[in-house]
Regions:
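Protein maturation boundaries and topogenic segments
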Residues: 1-76, 143-164
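Beta-strand-rich cores of mature extracytoplasmic or soluble domains
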Residues: 114-164
Length: 164
């Protein structure tokens, strides 16, 4: 005996499942996570040109050493919080509140030719962001501290796409 297939129920179930899947994907990648292919060398060697970055948009609490995506897809490492004093000397040594931070960055921190003057106190509601490749000064050294509401997300992991 053949059973009669109810096409309306079948198509309705497929439509509901497809709609739920689309909603879950929209919430995941439109609200919670941000996917971006990184272009540039200012975060080398931590983040390389062509890496796929996944950042968490919901995080609004950022600590020192967090790598964040901000402004128009810029990526940088937070080195100072609101109220901290940042100083960079002529030898390329950075001091936060008078102390040299324990960093694994192999590059000296150079001053920007134009930009802020030192010592610099990070304003309330902002963070001081530096590139890992410290010769590239397109970060807080040129553009002042970044407002926390301009941070798009905290980098939670990345996928190397070339040049392992």
């Amino acid at each position: 005996m053949k059973q009669k297939v109810n096409h309306k129920k079948y198509y309705r179930a497929v439509l509901i499942k497809t709609g739920l899947f689309a909603l879950v994907m929209f919430v995941t990648f439109g609200v919670i996570l941000n996917l971006k292919i990184y272009h540039g060398t200012n975060m080398y060697p931590g983040v390389r040109d062509g890496d796929l970055m996944v950042s968490l948009r919901l995080n609004k609490y950022f600590g020192n050493d967090d790598v964040v995506v901000y402004d128009n897809g810029k990526v940088g490492r937070i080195v100072a919080q609101p109220g901290d004093t940042v100083d960079i000397n002529d030898e390329g040594v950075i001091k936060i509140n008078g102390y040299i931070p324990a960093e694994t960055i192999p590059y000296k921190t150079v001053k920007a030719e134009e930009g802020i003057s030192y010592p610099y106190t990070v304003p309330e509601g902002s963070v001081f962001i530096l590139n890992d490749f410290r010769n590239d000064t397109d970060d807080s050294r040129e553009n002042e501290a970044v407002a926390k509401n301009k941070i798009k997300g905290k980098l939670i992991f990345l996928i190397r796409r070339r040049g392992f």
